[in-house]
Amino acid sequence: MPYMPSLSQLQQTDAFLRRHLGPDQGEQQAMLDALGLASREQLIEQTVPPAIRLQGELNLPPALDEQAALAKLKGYAEQNQLWTSLIGMGYHGTITPPVILRNVLENPGWYTAYTPYQPEIAQGRLEALLNYQQMIIDLTGLDLANASLLDEATAAAEAMTLARRMAKSKSNRFFVDENCHPQTLSVVQTRAEAFGFELVVGTLDDLAGHEVFGALLQYPDTHGEIRDLRPAIEQLHAQQALACVAADLLSLLLLTPPGELGADVVLGSTQRFGVPMGYGGPHAAYFASRDEFKRGMPGRIIGVSKDARGNTALRMALQTREQHIRREKANSNICTAQVLLANIAGFYAVYHGPQGLKRIAQRVHRLTAILAAGLEQKGIVRLNRHFFDTLTLEVGGAQTAIIESAEAAQINLRILGRGRLGVSLDETCDERTVEQLLAIFLGADHGLDVAALDAGELAAGIPAGLQRDSGYLEHPVFNSHHSETEMLRYLKQLENKDLALNQAMIPLGSCTMKLNATSEMIPITWAEFANLHPFVPRGQAQGYRLMIEELEAWLCAITGFDAISMQPNSGAQGEYAGLVAIRKYHESRGEGQRDICLIPSSAHGTNPASAQMVSMRVVIVECDKGGNVDLEDLKRKAAEAGDRLSCLMITYPSTHGVYEENVREICAAIHAQGGQVYMDGANLNAQVGLARPADIGADVSHMNLHKTFCIPHGGGGPGMGPIGVKAHLAPFVANHPVVELEGPQPGNGAVSAAPWGSASILPISWMYIAMMGPQLRDATEVAILGANYLANRLGGAFPVLYSGRNGRVAHECILDLRPLKAASGISEEDVAKRLMDYGFHAPTMSFPVPGTLMIEPTESESKAELDRFVEAMLSIRAEIAKVQDGEWPADNNPLVRAPHTLADVIGEWDRPYSIAEAVTPSAHARAHKYWPAVNRVDNVYGDRNLFCACVPVDAYRD
């Protein structure tokens, strides 16, 4: 009888690991052979300093297979209770059109793409973002919009800082209407304190008594009232201050746009444009301003330019405002924003069109008006005279009974206290919702009929002088794709223009573009995770609490920290949150004078940008010839700072792609002067299972869940940047004004709008860790193996700029193109653009060293894909040789004219190289050709001729 293995022998404890890792055991051994090594352990011994190595396995549960992990998480999800939440406060029920759900949110062609720094291979999502910007411009009545921020509260804080930069007022005081959403007020207070601004909170009537540089007003306000803001705005302008208005986007289909009222900045959330509440996020915040403030605008702006053939091409405009270029002088530390969600909101407008959107807004308003009329007939006092979708009601001693009745109907109301309740209707509401609410407030025998109320004359909720009469969304893109067939094809046309992970490796250094497994993505669209309001009673979110608590425990085990704050919803926001905690810690010890932040010259641009956001003075620490932090320079500057030293911000492994041997000594030098160590978590993918930041000496670190822990980049967001802290910093992390968190001190300000940030994407990281368990170390080791394999194979053609012990690199490596540029005139940009012709996304250009390419393969890429990349790079090196040898002119060769498009091929060809050499330079390109949508984009033209709205349809035609 043939041998039959037992069930225990057939159990696959590494089932997901084998799916996640690109190279199998045989390929890994071949890569090790190329390095002259016998095992991965030998590679790690040669690469990672012994002093920081983690002894033993990570303290994590054994790995689950995909089905078991999904089943466990589904069990958690089912403990969330899906009530009808009419709480409002900036979060509303919405309907995601299925064509958008399936073809964007659930489509790796959209969610695995990177930020469009390389516009030639990102025209699809750039067009989608331009549509989004046009939508915001039209609805707000302003001149310019960016391509999203993290959430409404963060956008409000950014508006305050823009006002300080741009207002001519000399005041240091900022006014906030007390009727703003409480979470917005808290985030603005945190930012104002960090910048040293004086914050005045009061009613609009109080504004006249204060000299300010700006003010934040809510429209409609948090209680639903619609006020004419023109008098307040005129007062602000009279004292050369800026008027910032936080506006409900759906209401602007019916209300006079704030721009027409005189507002300088308008901001808010696009959540109710088809993006689920998700227990707080992710959602794209919008941000619009007058044209004169464009160079003070935070975040990415998509602009119209032209390509080398003179055709219309889109790109990210005015990048010199941003942190990756201006560093501590940047307008903001914003890096990752909410591109995927902005695209969904923009597509929502494209699909519904202006009439469809207006119908949704009118329906919500009509339902609210019917409810208001019925309650008024029965004597319920409404505290807001005017309304769009929200009623604030005075119910006196009946409050408790009404709340109990609402709970029996599984409806959440906003409980304001002192006999006041709020109710906000939304797109998901209908006549049945109104019937339930009438019964809740009036009792079952109220005698009212919704149909009869609807048939009667209803008082207008919107003041006559604030009813919108201006047009919007007149561009053809918003009036052409209303059938599902047309929408489906439009989405596919845009997707086909872009290069994402579902087509090729994206070898961007410092970005960790690893696999975003399908099983990790599935739970985010489960209704139990997607449809919860962030301010529901905790008992209704028990599944979320269990999942988040478990994820926090796992992240503590992985990093060595004592506590985790999940609130920051990007890496840059994690930096800001960590620095705020450090500042509060020093102040608690009577050392508030500590304001110097040491930052190595190689740091990410977000580091100095974040430091300036908490009023720290940045002092740069030099690096030595080996790319390491110059220890003597660091010790000298730490000593010079003395009792003013606040912290050091350091990335580990370094942004130069090496494990610095003296990192413990670096941390000790800072601690000796009373400072704290902030470790940038951008390169955590090279530590997991091998070392832990807290053990190395870090006091606080953020974790890019959208890098190391598999949340996809989404074309520029969403992300999550929770911070880990040691016990002494735990009391000083962010709290929340609506949902008080356990651990942080009561009264600590918030750093984002929702208590747990973008909570609905946390299941992605939970799934990844659950399915990997202690085998996370394998992922780290294979990532290091891949980087060293590439460095070994490419080093002869392109020198590897920095290496660590035994000539090894960490999980990424930097190729130095400066000698080649000097010899041939071919730049790192030429090589990056030429890679597109081979079907690759470019590596990171000129960071952290100008004239270089930084490559990070991640553990998810197979040896075959790595070899294909090597072959492309070596082929490009041979092409450079032809330029050096004079075979091709320096100004007319495949590199300087890359990338090549279909328009090149079908046009007249008069170049000294063949069409085949241009567009099919490799066997893979011949078999699986990816065509960039445009030729090389003219960046200078785009900034000199700034245009950031939709262009005529004919402009996209060649």
Curated annotation (Swiss-Prot):
It comes from the Bacteria. Keywords: Oxidoreductase, Pyridoxal phosphate. Its EC number is 1.4.4.2. One of its GO terms (molecular function) is glycine binding. GO terms for cellular component: cytosol; glycine cleavage complex. Its cofactor is pyridoxal 5'-phosphate. One of its GO terms (biological process) is glycine decarboxylation via glycine cleavage system. Signal peptide: none annotated. Gene3D superfamilies: Aspartate Aminotransferase, domain 1, Type I PLP-dependent aspartate aminotransferase-like (Major domain). Belongs to the GcvP family. PANTHER family: GLYCINE DEHYDROGENASE (DECARBOXYLATING), GLYCINE DEHYDROGENASE, DECARBOXYLATING. NCBIfam families: gcvP (TIGR00461). The glycine cleavage system is composed of four proteins: P, T, L and H. The glycine cleavage system catalyzes the degradation of glycine. The P protein binds the alpha-amino group of glycine through its pyridoxal phosphate cofactor; CO(2) is released and the remaining methylamine moiety is then transferred to the lipoamide cofactor of the H protein. This is Glycine dehydrogenase (decarboxylating). The gene is gcvP.
